[in-house]
Amino acid sequence: MASPQSTKTGLNLPAGMNQTSLRLETFSSSFRGISSLSSPSKSTCSDRFIPCRSSSRLHAFDLQDKEPTTPVKEGGNEAYSRLLKSELFGSDFASPLLSPAGGQGSASSPMSPCTNMLRFKTDRSNSSPSSPFSPSILGNDNGHSSDSSPPPKPPRKVPKTPHKVLDAPSLQDDFYLNVVDWSSQNVLAVGLGTCVYLWTASNSKVTKLCDLGPNDSVCSVQWTREGSYISIGTSHGQVQVWDGTQCKRVRTMGGHQTRTGVLAWNSRILSSGSRDRNILQHDIRVQSDFVSKLVGHKSEVCGLKWSHDDRELASGGNDNQLLVWNNHSQQPILKLTEHTAAVKAITWSPHQSSLLASGGGTADRCIRFWNTTNGNQLNSIDTGSQVCNLAWSKNVNEIVSTHGYSQNQIMLWKYPSMSKVATLTGHSMRVLYLATSPDGQTIVTGAGDETLRFWNVFPSVKMQTPVKDTGLWSLGRTQIR
């Protein structure tokens, strides 16, 4: 049986819907049909299925702070955002955040600066942390990176204790003597009282070279550069030359009135300094005892060193003077009087010509550096102790100094900064004697405590590997066919 609604309209209408609502829907549909003639409209049908997730527990993963932010927290978030963008995209991308409010900055877009991230050529002169490939600004204190400078090397470790200690009885505690020297053939010569002993470093063999007798004593020893002959200065003013291999005396030369406390060889001339204030030049190829006399010091000569090119001779004396001589004159070309105590410690730089270092005694305590070309003092360092000896490393640009009162220490310096590399202690008395091994790595020090101590202070020479030729001439062919 049909319902009353269906009989009137002839349609089966659902419950709750009358003919009036149907008429309104029909009118609305006809109106939409008219409006579609003017402009097309998108279909109201959707091709996506959007599920309802009201029952899911996504709120459990919402870890953001729902509390209202404070100005301090907002400032921290802004600083963090600026730093993050600077780390990811460079400082230029974060710089608009620093611009005043209302500025024309483009901080919202990290790619706002127009820069080429990949280029065929890098302009090293304009490289800065703004480049996406530059190091992090967090690793630089000043905010500027330097692509060309390598990272700083860790400080070199120097052993604080000697690797060998030898007893040296009768080793004299006299500041003005020089009785220890190490030859280029790895033989150490030591003057002990009236005798000279040779210690071979390769096998620790000890050989007695000579005995001057009860009325004489050894005041200085010096090997030739080749290491075959050794000169000995005596308390009677003589200079003896011995064959170190055969242990035979070759020659004896006089000329000094009193003890000969210092000797220095160049390629062919032997220079000797004495308490009589004179410097004698000996040539063993001629018959006379000496070929020239250099007069300039007013007190005992206690330091002598030839430059590596044999052009200049530096002499130090108890008159606090440092004199520089050349081969063409018997008058000093330089008189350096800045020291206030005796100048015994003298060394020439093997790395730079005309660079001379000298050390003063107890009243001076300074190491001074000189340019012998113009006589200018380059630097002066107060060591705090009497400077007894100086030696420049031939392997690296470093210098070692031995000291007396008041600390009796051995100090290693880096030139030209003169920063301390190491300070070595062990001698109970002032360290009066110093010599360097032929490989330039080890030094031996002697003191009035009658001990010789061997220290490893300098690194070895870096051997440069030869560059292999990979060109056309390196194909291994010895002839053209």
Curated annotation (Swiss-Prot):
Q: Which Gene3D superfamilies match?
A: YVTN repeat-like/Quinoprotein amine dehydrogenase (2.130.10.10)
This protein's pathway: Protein modification; protein ubiquitination
Keyword presence, Repeat: yes
Q: Name one GO molecular function term.
A: anaphase-promoting complex binding
On whether Cell division is a keyword of this UniProt record, the answer is yes
Q: Which InterPro entries match?
A: Cdc20/Fizzy, WD40/YVTN_repeat-like_dom_sf, WD40_CDC20-Fz, WD40_repeat_CS, WD40_repeat_dom_sf, WD40_rpt
> Compositionally biased, Low complexity: which spans?
125-136
Where are the annotated segments for Disordered? 100-165
Q: Where is the composition biased (Basic residues)?
A: 154-163
Q: SMART domains, from UniProt?
A: WD40 (SM00320)
> Any idea which UniProt keywords this protein has?
Cell cycle, Cell division, Mitosis, Repeat, Ubl conjugation pathway, WD repeat
- State the protein's purpose: Activator protein that regulates the ubiquitin ligase activity and substrate specificity of the anaphase promoting complex/cyclosome (APC/C).
Other comments on record: FZR2 controls the induction of early rounds of endoreduplication while the remaining rounds may be mediated by FZR1 and FZR3.
Quaternary state and interactors: Associates with the APC/C complex. Interacts with CDC20-1, CDC20-2, CYCA1-1, CYCA3-4, CYCB1-1 and CYCB1-2. Binds to GIG1 and PYM.
Which family does the record assign?
Belongs to the WD repeat CDC20/Fizzy family.
Q: What is this protein called?
A: Protein FIZZY-RELATED 3
Q: Which organism is it from?
A: Arabidopsis thaliana (Mouse-ear cress)
The gene it comes from is: FZR3
